[in-house]
UniProtKB/Swiss-Prot annotation:
Species for this entry: Encephalitozoon cuniculi (strain GB-M1) (Microsporidian parasite)
Domain of life: Eukaryota
Record's compositionally biased regions (Basic and acidic residues): 344-353
Start-end of Acidic residues biased regions: 354-368
Name of this chain's protein: UPF0329 protein ECU02_0050
Length: 523
Protein backbone atom coordinates (compact mmCIF):
# COMPACT_ATOMS: atom_id res chain seq x y z
CA UNK A 1 0.00 0.00 0.00
CA UNK A 2 1.45 3.38 -0.97
CA UNK A 3 0.04 6.61 0.44
CA UNK A 4 -0.15 9.64 -1.85
CA UNK A 5 0.39 12.62 0.43
CA UNK A 6 2.43 15.34 -1.28
CA UNK A 7 2.21 19.05 -0.33
CA UNK A 8 -0.90 18.29 1.75
CA UNK A 9 -2.97 17.51 -1.34
CA UNK A 10 -4.83 14.35 -0.42
CA UNK A 11 -5.58 11.84 -3.18
CA UNK A 12 -8.21 9.38 -2.00
CA UNK A 13 -9.54 6.31 -3.75
CA UNK A 14 -13.02 5.22 -2.77
CA UNK A 15 -13.61 1.54 -3.52
CA UNK A 16 -17.08 1.16 -2.05
CA UNK A 17 -18.47 4.55 -3.01
CA UNK A 18 -19.30 3.59 -6.56
CA UNK A 19 -20.25 -0.04 -6.81
CA UNK A 20 -22.85 -2.61 -7.76
CA UNK A 21 -23.46 -6.17 -6.64
CA UNK A 22 -22.00 -7.43 -9.91
CA UNK A 23 -19.02 -5.08 -10.13
CA UNK A 24 -17.73 -4.07 -6.74
CA UNK A 25 -14.19 -3.05 -7.70
CA UNK A 26 -14.96 0.20 -9.50
CA UNK A 27 -13.34 3.25 -7.94
CA UNK A 28 -13.30 7.02 -8.26
CA UNK A 29 -10.56 9.44 -7.23
CA UNK A 30 -11.06 12.91 -5.82
CA UNK A 31 -8.90 15.62 -4.31
CA UNK A 32 -9.32 17.61 -1.10
CA UNK A 33 -7.51 20.78 -0.08
CA UNK A 34 -5.77 21.53 3.25
CA UNK A 35 -8.35 21.93 6.02
CA UNK A 36 -11.11 20.46 3.87
CA UNK A 37 -13.21 17.37 4.42
CA UNK A 38 -15.45 15.19 2.32
CA UNK A 39 -19.03 15.13 3.65
CA UNK A 40 -21.66 12.70 2.34
CA UNK A 41 -25.03 13.95 1.14
CA UNK A 42 -28.06 11.86 2.21
CA UNK A 43 -28.89 10.99 -1.41
CA UNK A 44 -28.25 7.75 -3.30
CA UNK A 45 -28.36 7.54 -7.09
CA UNK A 46 -28.72 4.69 -9.52
CA UNK A 47 -27.36 6.17 -12.71
CA UNK A 48 -29.06 9.53 -13.21
CA UNK A 49 -32.05 8.74 -10.97
CA UNK A 50 -32.40 9.58 -7.28
CA UNK A 51 -33.55 6.41 -5.50
CA UNK A 52 -32.91 7.41 -1.88
CA UNK A 53 -33.73 10.84 -0.42
CA UNK A 54 -33.03 12.18 3.09
CA UNK A 55 -36.66 11.39 3.97
CA UNK A 56 -36.68 7.85 2.49
CA UNK A 57 -37.54 4.97 4.82
CA UNK A 58 -36.88 1.30 4.08
CA UNK A 59 -40.61 0.72 3.61
CA UNK A 60 -40.49 3.27 0.75
CA UNK A 61 -37.65 1.35 -0.92
CA UNK A 62 -39.51 -1.96 -0.88
CA UNK A 63 -42.20 -0.49 -3.12
CA UNK A 64 -39.60 -0.10 -5.86
CA UNK A 65 -37.68 -3.39 -5.86
CA UNK A 66 -35.90 -2.72 -9.17
CA UNK A 67 -32.65 -1.57 -7.57
CA UNK A 68 -33.01 -3.26 -4.18
CA UNK A 69 -30.12 -5.69 -4.68
CA UNK A 70 -27.61 -2.95 -5.48
CA UNK A 71 -29.01 -0.66 -2.79
CA UNK A 72 -28.84 -3.39 -0.15
CA UNK A 73 -25.19 -3.98 -1.01
CA UNK A 74 -24.36 -0.29 -0.59
CA UNK A 75 -26.45 0.07 2.58
CA UNK A 76 -24.82 -3.02 4.09
CA UNK A 77 -21.42 -1.34 3.55
CA UNK A 78 -22.47 2.16 4.58
CA UNK A 79 -19.81 2.55 7.29
CA UNK A 80 -17.12 1.60 4.74
CA UNK A 81 -18.50 4.26 2.39
CA UNK A 82 -18.30 6.87 5.17
CA UNK A 83 -14.81 5.72 6.15
CA UNK A 84 -13.57 5.81 2.56
CA UNK A 85 -15.01 9.27 1.94
CA UNK A 86 -13.75 10.70 5.21
CA UNK A 87 -10.51 8.92 6.11
CA UNK A 88 -9.15 6.48 3.62
CA UNK A 89 -6.39 8.38 1.84
CA UNK A 90 -4.78 5.21 0.52
CA UNK A 91 -4.13 3.31 -2.67
CA UNK A 92 -4.19 -0.42 -1.96
CA UNK A 93 -1.71 -2.92 -3.33
CA UNK A 94 -2.38 -6.64 -3.04
CA UNK A 95 -0.72 -8.08 0.04
CA UNK A 96 0.26 -4.64 1.39
CA UNK A 97 1.21 -4.45 5.08
CA UNK A 98 -1.09 -1.52 5.79
CA UNK A 99 -3.97 -3.19 3.99
CA UNK A 100 -3.57 -6.28 6.15
CA UNK A 101 -3.47 -4.08 9.24
CA UNK A 102 -6.73 -2.41 8.20
CA UNK A 103 -8.33 -5.84 7.71
CA UNK A 104 -7.15 -6.91 11.15
CA UNK A 105 -7.89 -3.78 13.19
CA UNK A 106 -10.70 -1.86 11.48
CA UNK A 107 -12.65 -3.83 8.89
CA UNK A 108 -14.48 -6.02 11.41
CA UNK A 109 -15.56 -3.00 13.45
CA UNK A 110 -16.94 -1.21 10.38
CA UNK A 111 -18.72 -4.39 9.27
CA UNK A 112 -20.43 -4.50 12.67
CA UNK A 113 -21.54 -0.86 12.44
CA UNK A 114 -22.94 -1.42 8.94
CA UNK A 115 -24.85 -4.53 9.99
CA UNK A 116 -26.36 -2.83 13.05
CA UNK A 117 -27.59 0.24 11.18
CA UNK A 118 -28.93 -1.86 8.29
CA UNK A 119 -31.03 -3.86 10.78
CA UNK A 120 -32.16 -0.60 12.33
CA UNK A 121 -33.18 0.72 8.90
CA UNK A 122 -34.99 -2.45 7.80
CA UNK A 123 -36.85 -3.07 11.06
CA UNK A 124 -37.50 0.51 12.20
CA UNK A 125 -38.87 3.78 10.93
CA UNK A 126 -35.62 5.73 10.52
CA UNK A 127 -35.14 7.91 7.47
CA UNK A 128 -31.95 7.63 5.43
CA UNK A 129 -30.83 11.02 6.73
CA UNK A 130 -31.15 9.79 10.32
CA UNK A 131 -29.39 6.53 9.43
CA UNK A 132 -26.41 8.32 7.89
CA UNK A 133 -26.01 10.47 11.00
CA UNK A 134 -25.97 7.34 13.18
CA UNK A 135 -23.27 5.80 10.96
CA UNK A 136 -21.07 8.87 11.45
CA UNK A 137 -21.64 8.83 15.21
CA UNK A 138 -20.76 5.14 15.56
CA UNK A 139 -17.84 5.20 13.16
CA UNK A 140 -16.01 8.03 14.93
CA UNK A 141 -17.32 7.42 18.50
CA UNK A 142 -16.71 11.00 19.61
CA UNK A 143 -18.93 10.63 22.68
CA UNK A 144 -17.64 7.22 23.71
CA UNK A 145 -16.27 6.87 27.24
CA UNK A 146 -14.23 3.88 26.15
CA UNK A 147 -11.14 3.84 23.98
CA UNK A 148 -12.22 4.63 20.42
CA UNK A 149 -11.63 1.94 17.79
CA UNK A 150 -10.31 4.59 15.41
CA UNK A 151 -7.70 5.68 17.98
CA UNK A 152 -6.59 2.08 18.61
CA UNK A 153 -6.26 1.52 14.87
CA UNK A 154 -4.25 4.74 14.62
CA UNK A 155 -1.77 3.50 17.25
CA UNK A 156 -1.25 0.27 15.29
CA UNK A 157 -0.79 2.25 12.07
CA UNK A 158 1.83 4.52 13.61
CA UNK A 159 3.82 1.51 14.87
CA UNK A 160 3.64 -0.12 11.44
CA UNK A 161 4.71 3.09 9.68
CA UNK A 162 7.68 3.45 12.07
CA UNK A 163 8.69 -0.14 11.29
CA UNK A 164 8.45 0.55 7.56
CA UNK A 165 10.68 3.63 7.92
CA UNK A 166 13.29 1.66 9.88
CA UNK A 167 13.29 -1.38 7.59
CA UNK A 168 13.40 0.01 4.07
CA UNK A 169 14.54 -2.46 1.39
CA UNK A 170 18.33 -2.41 0.94
CA UNK A 171 18.01 -2.50 -2.85
CA UNK A 172 16.29 0.92 -2.90
CA UNK A 173 18.38 3.92 -3.93
CA UNK A 174 18.90 6.77 -1.46
CA UNK A 175 16.65 8.98 -3.54
CA UNK A 176 13.85 6.38 -3.45
CA UNK A 177 14.34 5.89 0.30
CA UNK A 178 14.12 9.63 0.92
CA UNK A 179 10.93 9.86 -1.13
CA UNK A 180 9.35 6.93 0.71
CA UNK A 181 10.48 8.29 4.10
CA UNK A 182 8.91 11.67 3.34
CA UNK A 183 5.60 10.08 2.27
CA UNK A 184 5.47 7.83 5.32
CA UNK A 185 6.23 10.71 7.71
CA UNK A 186 3.40 12.72 6.16
CA UNK A 187 1.11 9.73 6.56
CA UNK A 188 2.20 9.31 10.18
CA UNK A 189 1.36 12.95 10.89
CA UNK A 190 -2.11 12.47 9.41
CA UNK A 191 -2.73 9.26 11.36
CA UNK A 192 -1.89 11.09 14.61
CA UNK A 193 -5.13 13.04 14.04
CA UNK A 194 -7.04 9.79 14.68
CA UNK A 195 -6.63 10.65 18.39
CA UNK A 196 -8.05 14.16 17.90
CA UNK A 197 -11.62 13.57 19.08
CA UNK A 198 -12.56 17.23 18.66
CA UNK A 199 -11.63 17.15 14.96
CA UNK A 200 -13.89 14.18 14.27
CA UNK A 201 -16.62 15.66 16.44
CA UNK A 202 -16.64 18.60 14.02
CA UNK A 203 -16.95 16.17 11.10
CA UNK A 204 -19.96 14.50 12.75
CA UNK A 205 -21.52 17.90 13.55
CA UNK A 206 -21.06 19.08 9.96
CA UNK A 207 -22.61 15.87 8.63
CA UNK A 208 -25.66 16.28 10.88
CA UNK A 209 -26.06 19.88 9.77
CA UNK A 210 -25.83 18.93 6.07
CA UNK A 211 -28.29 16.03 6.53
CA UNK A 212 -30.86 18.22 8.27
CA UNK A 213 -30.41 20.98 5.69
CA UNK A 214 -30.87 18.52 2.82
CA UNK A 215 -34.06 17.26 4.47
CA UNK A 216 -35.42 20.84 4.62
CA UNK A 217 -34.47 21.40 0.99
CA UNK A 218 -36.23 18.18 -0.06
CA UNK A 219 -39.42 19.03 1.79
CA UNK A 220 -39.51 22.46 0.17
CA UNK A 221 -38.96 21.44 -3.46
CA UNK A 222 -40.95 19.59 -6.09
CA UNK A 223 -39.40 16.43 -7.57
CA UNK A 224 -38.43 18.12 -10.84
CA UNK A 225 -36.82 21.03 -8.94
CA UNK A 226 -34.84 18.58 -6.83
CA UNK A 227 -33.63 16.72 -9.92
CA UNK A 228 -32.46 20.03 -11.36
CA UNK A 229 -30.57 20.76 -8.16
CA UNK A 230 -28.80 17.38 -8.26
CA UNK A 231 -28.37 17.09 -12.01
CA UNK A 232 -24.57 17.17 -11.97
CA UNK A 233 -23.11 16.39 -8.54
CA UNK A 234 -19.48 15.77 -7.62
CA UNK A 235 -19.69 11.96 -7.60
CA UNK A 236 -21.37 11.84 -10.99
CA UNK A 237 -18.72 14.12 -12.50
CA UNK A 238 -15.88 11.94 -11.23
CA UNK A 239 -17.51 8.71 -12.39
CA UNK A 240 -17.90 10.23 -15.86
CA UNK A 241 -14.30 11.42 -15.90
CA UNK A 242 -12.95 8.11 -14.61
CA UNK A 243 -15.09 5.52 -16.36
CA UNK A 244 -17.20 7.31 -18.95
CA UNK A 245 -20.88 8.08 -19.43
CA UNK A 246 -21.83 4.41 -19.89
CA UNK A 247 -20.55 3.59 -16.40
CA UNK A 248 -22.79 6.20 -14.75
CA UNK A 249 -26.05 4.62 -15.92
CA UNK A 250 -25.33 1.31 -14.13
CA UNK A 251 -23.69 2.65 -10.99
CA UNK A 252 -25.10 2.96 -7.47
CA UNK A 253 -23.45 5.84 -5.62
CA UNK A 254 -24.01 8.49 -2.94
CA UNK A 255 -23.38 12.17 -3.57
CA UNK A 256 -20.86 14.14 -1.52
CA UNK A 257 -19.31 17.57 -1.10
CA UNK A 258 -15.77 18.68 -0.37
CA UNK A 259 -15.85 21.62 2.01
CA UNK A 260 -13.96 23.47 4.71
CA UNK A 261 -16.14 22.25 7.59
CA UNK A 262 -14.88 24.88 10.05
CA UNK A 263 -15.97 27.58 7.62
CA UNK A 264 -19.34 25.91 7.09
CA UNK A 265 -20.00 25.45 10.82
CA UNK A 266 -18.97 29.04 11.57
CA UNK A 267 -21.33 30.29 8.84
CA UNK A 268 -24.17 28.28 10.35
CA UNK A 269 -23.55 29.63 13.86
CA UNK A 270 -23.15 33.23 12.69
CA UNK A 271 -25.85 33.50 10.02
CA UNK A 272 -28.33 30.71 10.79
CA UNK A 273 -30.09 27.96 8.89
CA UNK A 274 -31.34 29.99 5.91
CA UNK A 275 -27.79 30.91 4.87
CA UNK A 276 -26.63 27.31 5.43
CA UNK A 277 -29.47 26.08 3.23
CA UNK A 278 -28.45 28.46 0.44
CA UNK A 279 -24.79 27.37 0.73
CA UNK A 280 -25.73 23.67 0.53
CA UNK A 281 -27.93 24.40 -2.49
CA UNK A 282 -24.99 26.06 -4.22
CA UNK A 283 -22.79 23.05 -3.43
CA UNK A 284 -25.43 20.72 -4.85
CA UNK A 285 -25.48 22.87 -7.99
CA UNK A 286 -21.72 22.35 -8.36
CA UNK A 287 -20.17 25.35 -6.60
CA UNK A 288 -16.52 24.46 -6.13
CA UNK A 289 -14.95 24.30 -2.71
CA UNK A 290 -12.31 26.92 -3.49
CA UNK A 291 -15.07 29.38 -4.46
CA UNK A 292 -16.72 29.13 -1.03
CA UNK A 293 -14.74 31.42 1.25
CA UNK A 294 -15.68 33.98 3.92
CA UNK A 295 -16.27 36.64 1.29
CA UNK A 296 -18.67 34.41 -0.65
CA UNK A 297 -20.51 33.43 2.55
CA UNK A 298 -20.91 37.14 3.34
CA UNK A 299 -22.46 37.72 -0.10
CA UNK A 300 -24.88 34.84 0.45
CA UNK A 301 -25.82 36.17 3.90
CA UNK A 302 -26.51 39.64 2.46
CA UNK A 303 -28.61 38.14 -0.34
CA UNK A 304 -30.67 36.15 2.17
CA UNK A 305 -31.18 39.27 4.32
CA UNK A 306 -32.32 41.25 1.29
CA UNK A 307 -34.73 38.48 0.33
CA UNK A 308 -36.16 38.52 3.86
CA UNK A 309 -36.48 42.31 3.76
CA UNK A 310 -38.39 42.19 0.48
CA UNK A 311 -40.56 39.38 1.83
CA UNK A 312 -41.37 41.32 4.99
CA UNK A 313 -42.24 44.39 2.96
CA UNK A 314 -44.59 42.33 0.82
CA UNK A 315 -46.15 40.80 3.93
CA UNK A 316 -46.76 44.23 5.46
CA UNK A 317 -48.42 45.25 2.21
CA UNK A 318 -50.64 42.17 2.25
CA UNK A 319 -51.53 42.61 5.92
CA UNK A 320 -52.58 46.22 5.33
CA UNK A 321 -54.72 45.13 2.40
CA UNK A 322 -56.25 42.39 4.54
CA UNK A 323 -57.12 44.91 7.24
CA UNK A 324 -58.69 47.26 4.68
CA UNK A 325 -60.72 44.42 3.18
CA UNK A 326 -61.92 43.30 6.60
CA UNK A 327 -63.00 46.83 7.49
CA UNK A 328 -64.99 47.02 4.26
CA UNK A 329 -66.56 43.64 4.95
CA UNK A 330 -67.63 44.72 8.44
CA UNK A 331 -69.32 47.86 7.08
CA UNK A 332 -71.47 45.90 4.65
CA UNK A 333 -74.76 44.41 5.67
CA UNK A 334 -74.68 40.76 6.45
CA UNK A 335 -76.20 38.65 3.75
CA UNK A 336 -79.28 36.65 4.30
CA UNK A 337 -78.42 33.45 6.08
CA UNK A 338 -79.28 30.20 4.47
CA UNK A 339 -81.80 28.09 6.28
CA UNK A 340 -81.23 24.44 6.86
CA UNK A 341 -83.41 21.58 7.93
CA UNK A 342 -83.94 20.88 11.61
CA UNK A 343 -82.38 17.43 11.35
CA UNK A 344 -79.22 18.81 9.71
CA UNK A 345 -78.86 21.48 12.37
CA UNK A 346 -79.26 18.90 15.12
CA UNK A 347 -76.63 16.67 13.52
CA UNK A 348 -74.21 19.59 13.27
CA UNK A 349 -74.95 20.56 16.85
CA UNK A 350 -74.32 17.01 18.03
CA UNK A 351 -71.05 16.72 16.13
CA UNK A 352 -69.67 20.03 17.32
CA UNK A 353 -70.78 19.68 20.93
CA UNK A 354 -67.75 17.48 21.60
CA UNK A 355 -66.01 20.36 23.32
CA UNK A 356 -64.08 21.16 26.44
CA UNK A 357 -64.17 24.44 28.35
CA UNK A 358 -60.77 25.75 29.44
CA UNK A 359 -60.53 28.57 31.95
CA UNK A 360 -57.60 30.74 33.06
CA UNK A 361 -55.23 29.10 35.53
CA UNK A 362 -56.49 25.60 34.74
CA UNK A 363 -54.49 22.81 33.13
CA UNK A 364 -55.98 20.88 30.23
CA UNK A 365 -55.20 17.63 32.02
CA UNK A 366 -57.32 18.40 35.13
CA UNK A 367 -60.33 16.13 35.83
CA UNK A 368 -63.43 16.76 33.74
CA UNK A 369 -67.00 15.58 33.82
CA UNK A 370 -69.17 14.45 30.94
CA UNK A 371 -72.09 16.79 30.23
CA UNK A 372 -74.42 15.76 27.40
CA UNK A 373 -71.69 14.41 25.14
CA UNK A 374 -69.32 17.25 26.02
CA UNK A 375 -66.52 17.30 28.59
CA UNK A 376 -66.82 20.36 30.78
CA UNK A 377 -64.13 21.58 33.17
CA UNK A 378 -65.12 21.79 36.82
CA UNK A 379 -62.87 24.76 37.59
CA UNK A 380 -63.74 28.37 38.46
CA UNK A 381 -66.00 30.56 36.38
CA UNK A 382 -64.60 33.46 34.40
CA UNK A 383 -64.10 36.63 36.40
CA UNK A 384 -62.97 40.21 35.86
CA UNK A 385 -64.48 40.58 32.41
CA UNK A 386 -62.53 37.63 31.01
CA UNK A 387 -64.15 35.95 28.05
CA UNK A 388 -65.21 32.35 28.20
CA UNK A 389 -64.61 29.73 25.52
CA UNK A 390 -65.07 26.03 25.11
CA UNK A 391 -62.46 24.09 23.15
CA UNK A 392 -63.43 21.56 20.50
CA UNK A 393 -61.72 18.19 20.76
CA UNK A 394 -60.20 18.59 17.25
CA UNK A 395 -58.20 21.54 18.68
CA UNK A 396 -57.31 19.76 21.93
CA UNK A 397 -56.08 16.76 19.95
CA UNK A 398 -52.98 18.70 18.95
CA UNK A 399 -51.80 18.70 22.58
CA UNK A 400 -51.35 14.93 22.42
CA UNK A 401 -48.27 13.08 21.21
CA UNK A 402 -47.86 12.60 17.43
CA UNK A 403 -48.30 8.86 17.93
CA UNK A 404 -51.63 9.33 19.73
CA UNK A 405 -52.83 11.85 17.13
CA UNK A 406 -52.03 9.41 14.31
CA UNK A 407 -53.83 6.60 16.12
CA UNK A 408 -56.99 8.70 16.51
CA UNK A 409 -56.88 9.97 12.93
CA UNK A 410 -56.41 6.51 11.45
CA UNK A 411 -59.48 5.30 13.36
CA UNK A 412 -61.54 8.42 12.65
CA UNK A 413 -64.05 9.19 9.94
CA UNK A 414 -62.23 12.14 8.32
CA UNK A 415 -60.71 10.68 5.15
CA UNK A 416 -58.21 13.49 4.56
CA UNK A 417 -56.45 12.87 7.88
CA UNK A 418 -56.07 9.11 7.54
CA UNK A 419 -52.66 7.67 6.73
CA UNK A 420 -50.70 10.79 7.64
CA UNK A 421 -47.10 9.99 8.61
CA UNK A 422 -45.68 10.85 12.02
CA UNK A 423 -43.32 13.24 10.26
CA UNK A 424 -46.23 15.17 8.71
CA UNK A 425 -48.05 15.24 12.04
CA UNK A 426 -44.98 16.59 13.87
CA UNK A 427 -44.65 19.36 11.29
CA UNK A 428 -48.33 20.30 11.59
CA UNK A 429 -48.24 20.13 15.40
CA UNK A 430 -45.87 23.10 15.44
CA UNK A 431 -48.57 25.28 13.86
CA UNK A 432 -51.62 23.85 15.67
CA UNK A 433 -50.37 23.24 19.23
CA UNK A 434 -50.61 26.92 20.21
CA UNK A 435 -53.07 26.72 23.09
CA UNK A 436 -51.27 29.60 24.80
CA UNK A 437 -53.04 31.90 22.33
CA UNK A 438 -56.32 31.19 24.12
CA UNK A 439 -55.03 32.94 27.24
CA UNK A 440 -54.79 36.13 25.22
CA UNK A 441 -58.11 35.44 23.49
CA UNK A 442 -59.89 35.26 26.86
CA UNK A 443 -58.31 38.44 28.21
CA UNK A 444 -60.15 41.81 28.28
CA UNK A 445 -57.46 43.14 25.88
CA UNK A 446 -58.18 40.53 23.20
CA UNK A 447 -59.72 43.13 20.87
CA UNK A 448 -56.39 44.94 20.70
CA UNK A 449 -54.82 41.91 19.01
CA UNK A 450 -57.62 39.97 17.32
CA UNK A 451 -59.65 41.31 14.45
CA UNK A 452 -63.17 39.99 13.89
CA UNK A 453 -63.56 39.18 10.19
CA UNK A 454 -67.31 38.74 10.46
CA UNK A 455 -69.92 36.03 11.00
CA UNK A 456 -71.27 33.43 8.62
CA UNK A 457 -73.51 30.38 8.83
CA UNK A 458 -72.52 26.79 8.13
CA UNK A 459 -74.51 23.65 8.87
CA UNK A 460 -77.09 25.60 10.81
CA UNK A 461 -74.64 27.12 13.27
CA UNK A 462 -73.39 30.70 13.41
CA UNK A 463 -69.64 30.91 13.01
CA UNK A 464 -67.06 33.59 13.60
CA UNK A 465 -63.50 33.97 12.37
CA UNK A 466 -60.83 36.07 14.09
CA UNK A 467 -57.26 36.76 13.02
CA UNK A 468 -54.18 38.27 14.65
CA UNK A 469 -50.74 39.07 13.32
CA UNK A 470 -47.91 37.47 15.27
CA UNK A 471 -44.58 35.67 15.18
CA UNK A 472 -44.21 32.00 16.09
CA UNK A 473 -40.84 30.97 17.51
CA UNK A 474 -39.98 27.29 17.06
CA UNK A 475 -36.77 25.36 16.48
CA UNK A 476 -34.63 28.50 16.46
CA UNK A 477 -36.75 30.15 13.75
CA UNK A 478 -39.01 33.18 14.00
CA UNK A 479 -41.91 32.83 11.58
CA UNK A 480 -44.17 35.75 10.76
CA UNK A 481 -47.78 34.85 10.11
CA UNK A 482 -51.45 35.06 10.99
CA UNK A 483 -53.14 33.34 13.93
CA UNK A 484 -56.53 32.01 12.81
CA UNK A 485 -59.29 31.32 15.35
CA UNK A 486 -62.63 29.88 14.28
CA UNK A 487 -65.61 29.62 16.66
CA UNK A 488 -69.28 28.68 16.65
CA UNK A 489 -72.02 29.11 19.26
CA UNK A 490 -72.66 26.13 21.50
CA UNK A 491 -76.30 25.18 22.08
CA UNK A 492 -78.03 25.75 24.40
CA UNK A 493 -75.43 27.67 26.46
CA UNK A 494 -74.46 30.08 23.67
CA UNK A 495 -70.82 29.85 24.77
CA UNK A 496 -68.33 30.24 21.85
CA UNK A 497 -66.55 27.00 20.90
CA UNK A 498 -63.06 27.19 19.39
CA UNK A 499 -63.06 24.56 16.63
CA UNK A 500 -60.16 25.94 14.56
CA UNK A 501 -56.82 27.21 15.87
CA UNK A 502 -53.82 27.55 13.60
CA UNK A 503 -50.75 29.67 12.87
CA UNK A 504 -50.41 30.27 9.12
CA UNK A 505 -46.86 31.23 8.11
CA UNK A 506 -46.40 34.14 5.74
CA UNK A 507 -42.64 34.63 6.15
CA UNK A 508 -39.50 33.78 8.12
CA UNK A 509 -38.20 36.29 10.68
CA UNK A 510 -40.30 39.37 11.04
CA UNK A 511 -41.86 42.20 12.90
CA UNK A 512 -44.07 42.36 15.92
CA UNK A 513 -44.12 40.28 19.03
CA UNK A 514 -43.36 36.64 19.56
CA UNK A 515 -45.78 33.84 20.29
CA UNK A 516 -44.13 30.75 21.71
CA UNK A 517 -45.78 27.43 20.88
CA UNK A 518 -47.44 25.29 23.48
CA UNK A 519 -47.64 27.83 26.25
CA UNK A 520 -46.96 31.36 27.43
CA UNK A 521 -46.74 34.11 24.88
CA UNK A 522 -45.12 37.54 24.98
CA UNK A 523 -47.07 39.90 22.78
Amino acid sequence: MRWKYAAWILIAVVDVMCCSSEEKSASVSFVTRPGSQVIAFPFIFVGHSIVVLPTTKYSNLKRNAKSMEDLTFLLSNLSHVVWSLTIDATVYKDGGRLEKLFDKRMRGYLDGVSLDVLRMYVNGSKTFSELLQIVYERTFECDSRRSRQMARYGESLIREIDNMIESMPAEMSEEEKEKMRSDLNNNRKYVESFHDTEKWRQVVEAEKMVCNTCKEICLGLKEEELMGLLAEGSAKKYIKASAGESKVSSTVYPEYIVVDISLLLDAHREHGGDVTKELVKQMLLGKKEEEIDKRYIGKVANAVKERRRRGEKEIEKRVKKLLRDEEKAKSKKRGKRKSVGVSEAKEEEKKESETEEVEAGEEVEMPSEEVGGARRKTGKKSEGGRKRYKIHRRVLRWRKSPEKIKEEWDKGSEERWRGKSLEEIREQKVFHDIMGVLELLRSPDADRFFMDTGDYTKGGSERQRMVAIGVLESGGKRMLGVVEVGTFKDCPSGCPVVYHLMFRVTGIEGMGDVMRRGGGQSW
